[in-house]
From Swiss-Prot:
The active site is at E328. Autocatalytically cleaved in response to mitochondrial depolarization both at the N-terminus and C-terminus to generate the short active form (S-OMA1). Autocatalytic processing at the C-terminus takes place at residues 447-456. The S-OMA1 form is unstable. OMA1 pre-processing by AFG3L2 may participate in maturation before OMA1 autocatalytic cleavage. Degraded by YMEL1 in response to membrane depolarization. Protein turnover is regulated by prohibitin (PHB and PHB2), which promotes degradation of OMA1 in a cardiolipin-binding manner. It comes from the Eukaryota. It comes from Bos taurus (Bovine). PROSITE patterns: ZINC_PROTEASE. Its cofactor is Zn(2+). Residues 148-167 are annotated as: Cardiolipin-binding. Keywords: Autocatalytic cleavage, Disulfide bond, Hydrolase, Lipid-binding, Membrane, Metal-binding, Metalloprotease, Mitochondrion, Mitochondrion inner membrane, Protease, Transit peptide, Transmembrane, Transmembrane helix, Zinc, Zymogen. This is Metalloendopeptidase OMA1, mitochondrial. It is a single-pass membrane protein. The gene is OMA1. Zn(2+) binds at H327, H331, E392. Pfam families: Peptidase_M48. Residues 165-195 are annotated as: Stress-sensor region.
């Protein structure tokens, strides 16, 4: 567990420590820490030979800026890359002014830097709570796609009505005498073409309804189903926002809190650098930081951003936080909540038809209940969850592009999910199949991001971002894992040897050979 201790301690201290480095590069009075140095801290924690920022230094005071801006070179030819710097020469001067060789060196000076204590941890097991890791999602499962309040209330009533109607049809059919049943069947055979025409008309209306409610996303170019109006859905988002504020009213950080300032700076920088993305400038983005150990973050469709401090304690650096917030912003810009709610309502409507049919044709209530359960599970695992995973993958792709345009080190995006996967395995959690979850597995997300990183790096180049320097954080993470496993193996061998040495050894009394010979000869 020493690795998690080192990882989280370094995350909590270096996360705020790096914000200080982002703001003081022109002053030349801050000791620079490169990406290699930072990851060496984690390795040193693993082998308990800390050479730099370690656990013993966890209670030092570290400054945190009120805001920061990433460096962007001015380029009038590329309107897609909004800029926030004076010129590329500033960045070159900064590289000469400080030994900071990581991509964080492209920062502008800040003012009014508040001072906050970096939190230290008393026990390594407290760094990544087991419950929080297993339930971690960057978007809450239920709240990512809020349904209309009226339909949420009527949904159980609709199912109950479908069951009553289906069961009533079955009872009516069972109560009919045999001769009337034959007459009814004969009537159906005579009017089979009328019945076929009626069903075909219903199916045609359904298809027309579906295609007339398709909209093409201006960001991805993908067609999506939107049944609810935007204004209607925004009103529902306001209702959900009020519910969240009521729940977290006692846990909200103030706007002067350093963690709030940090999150606000990251979000505003991402928004500023992606003003050309359709929909971003139309949303009023408001940040809320919740003081909670849960590792979570989500954005409501109306631009209300909720970030939990547990997530801030879990990210290694500003790059990981920028990607995660970019992922959540992508959810809002792509209108995933409205899209998911529309699909759910459409499937629920079809489900009511199947539910009525199941209760009508099943001869017993027990079989009808079994059929209803099978139908709900098929809908959940064949449509709901796969579609949710598809939306998550799309948000990862667009969020990575948003982070790339903000000159973030996009290589750190996959490292976060590798850390989460390793933490789960370290806690002994069973690896559940991905099809059981609404989100892709941590390992699959990391692999998906690794495939997208080359394209994101090209986006950084087109936006004239400074080139990334220093070692690849993915390579450093693998090195950390290797050192951790070797250290764990060495510690295990030492523990076994100590236990063996501690076992009581019975001293056998040595019998002289002459005594044995004398006994055998009988002398």
């Amino acid at each position: 567990m020493s690795f998690i201790y080192g990882l989280q301690s370094a995350a909590r201290n270096c996360f705020f420590f790096r914000f200080n480095l982002l703001t003081n590069w022109r002053k030349c009075n801050t000791q620079a820490v490169t990406s290699r140095d930072f990851h060496q801290v984690k390795i040193n924690h693993i082998v308990n030979k800390s050479l730099g920022l370690g656990v013993n230094h966890g209670d030092r005071w570290t400054p945190l800026p009120e805001n920061f801006l990433f460096y962007r070179t001015f380029n009038t030819k590329r309107k897609g890359c909004l800029l926030s710097s004076r010129s590329k020469e500033i960045w070159m001067i900064s590289r000469k002014c400080t030994a900071w060789t990581d991509s964080f060196s492209r920062q502008l000076p800040m003012k009014n830097v508040p001072v906050v204590p970096a939190h230290s941890m008393s026990h390594p097991l407290n760094c990544l709570p087991t419950r929080d890791i297993r339930s971690f999602h960057t978007s809450p499962r239920c709240q990512a796609a809020p349904a209309p309040l009226l339909l949420m209330i009527l949904k159980p009533a609709q199912k109950l009505l479908a069951i009553i109607v289906g069961r009533g049809i079955r009872k009516w059919w069972q109560a009919l005498p045999p001769n009337k049943k034959e007459l009814f069947k004969e009537s159906l055979r005579k009017n089979k073409w009328k019945l076929f025409l009626g069903l075909s008309s219903f199916g045609l209306l359904f298809v027309v309804f579906y295609f007339t409610h398709l909209e093409v996303s201006p960001v991805t170019g993908r067609s999506k189903l939107l049944i609810l109006g935007k204004e209607h859905f925004r009103l529902l988002s306001e209702l959900e926002y009020e519910a969240w504020m009521e729940e977290f009213k006692n846990d909200m950080l103030t706007e002067k809190d350093a963690r709030y300032v940090a999150v606000k700076a990251v979000v505003h920088h991402l928004i500023e650098c992606n003003q050309d993305i359709p929909g971003i400038s139309e949303i009023n983005w408001i940040i809320h930081v919740v003081d909670s150990p849960d590792i979570n973050a989500f954005v409501l469709p109306n631009g209300q951003v909720f970030v939990f401090t547990g997530l801030l304690n879990s990210v290694t650096d500003i790059h990981q936080l920028s990607f995660l917030l970019g992922h959540e912003i992508a959810h809002a810009v792509l209108e995933h909540a409205a899209e998911k709610a529309s699909l759910v309502h459409l499937l629920d409507f079809l489900g009511l038809i199947f539910l009525t049919t199941i209760w009508a044709i099943c001869p017993r209530d027990s079989l009808a209940l079994l059929g209803q359960w099978i139908q709900s599970k098929l809908q959940e695992f064949l449509f709901d969850r796969p579609y949710s995973r598809t939306l998550e993958a799309e948000a990862d792709r667009i969020g990575l592009q948003l982070a790339a345009k903000a000159c973030v080190d996009v290589r750190a995006s996959s490292v976060f999910w590798q850390q989460m996967e390793f933490a789960e395995s370290l806690h002994g959690h069973p690896k559940l199949p991905e099809w059981l979850s609404t989100h892709p597995s941590h390992g699959n997300r990391a692999e998906h991001l690794d495939r997208l990183i080359p394209q994101a790096l090209k986006i950084r180049e087109t936006c004239n971002c400074p080139p990334l320097s220093g070692p690849d954080p993915r390579l450093l993470f693998k090195l950390s894992m290797k050192n951790f496993l070797e250290a764990e193996k060495e510690d295990l061998n030492i523990t076994v040897k100590q236990k063996m040495d501690a076992l009581p050894i019975q001293n056998q009394k040595q019998i002289p050979l002459t005594c044995i010979v004398d006994k055998r000869t009988g002398s």
